[in-house]
């Protein structure tokens, strides 16, 4: 009997070690088009950063990308997308949080204000992640490729990416201008306030774009 019990305990310990060593940690990505999955790979060179993130990890890490084109922190919550992430989140998982591009837009279903509703949504993502035992990481926005001499007031990202704006050539500057304002500051402030890891994606992508130049 003792021999069988010892064998059973050894088996249980072996299974425990095996399941512990093969535990998969998930990185959930929530955000907008700059992180989202893209289709039509053959004809569309555009890639969201969330698409390529898996390539930086081994098979013990799973990247689950929930970022969607056109979403703000507000619409991501209101459409039930955040709840879907929470339902799948387990202790030890990470949530990479990046919004701002569409929070700037004037449309009421998207718009939030930095220092107010935008910050409140970021806090919600952080606090609810922690309540589930997850680890939140805040990012600010990827820069737009705006090589204009002045900040063009337009809520159409596609127009802002073009070299011609309303029929007039606008690239007459070699300086990449900021189009996000306080929306890139808010994630940093919330990260400091709540002691959350912060990734300055604005600076990282600004430096990359600047090194490549206008034609890059």
Each language-model region and where it sits:
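Bacterial Sec-dependent signal peptides at the C-terminal "C-region" and cleavage site
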Residues: 3-24
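N-terminal, helix-rich and Lys/Arg-enriched segments in bacterial and organellar proteins
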Residues: 5-7, 12, 29-36, 53, ...
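Hydrophobic alpha-helical membrane context
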Residues: 14-16, 44, 110
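Serine-esterase "nucleophile elbow" of acetyl-processing enzymes
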Residues: 22-67, 83-91
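Cell-envelope and extracellular/periplasmic
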Residues: 27-29, 33-39, 59, 66-76, ...
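Generic alpha-helical scaffold signal
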Residues: 47, 76-79
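Alpha-helical cap/lid subdomain in secreted, periplasmic
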Residues: 80-216
């Amino acid at each position: 009997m003792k021999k069988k019990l010892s064998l059973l305990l050894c088996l249980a310990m072996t299974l425990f070690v095996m399941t512990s060593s093969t535990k998969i940690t998930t990185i959930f990505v929530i955000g907008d088009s700059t992180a989202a999955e893209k289709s039509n790979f053959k004809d569309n060179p555009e890639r969201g950063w969330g698409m390529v993130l898996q390539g930086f990890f081994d098979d013990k890490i799973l990247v689950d990308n929930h970022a969607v084109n056109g979403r703000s922190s507000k619409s991501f919550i209101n459409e039930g997308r955040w709840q879907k992430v929470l339902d799948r989140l387990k202790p030890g998982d990470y949530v990479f949080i990046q919004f701002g591009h569409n929070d700037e837009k004037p449309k009421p279903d998207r718009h939030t204000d930095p220092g107010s509703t935008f910050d409140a949504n970021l806090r919600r993502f952080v606090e609810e992640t922690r309540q589930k035992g997850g680890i939140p990481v805040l990012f600010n926005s990827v820069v737009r490729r705006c090589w204009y001499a002045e900040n063009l007031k337009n809520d159409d990202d596609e127009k802002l990416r073009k070299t011609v704006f309303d029929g007039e050539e606008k690239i007459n500057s070699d300086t990449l201008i900021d189009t996000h304002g306080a929306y890139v500051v808010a994630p940093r402030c919330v990260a400091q306030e709540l002691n959350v890891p912060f990734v300055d994606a604005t600076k990282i992508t600004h430096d990359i774009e600047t090194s490549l130049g206008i034609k890059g």
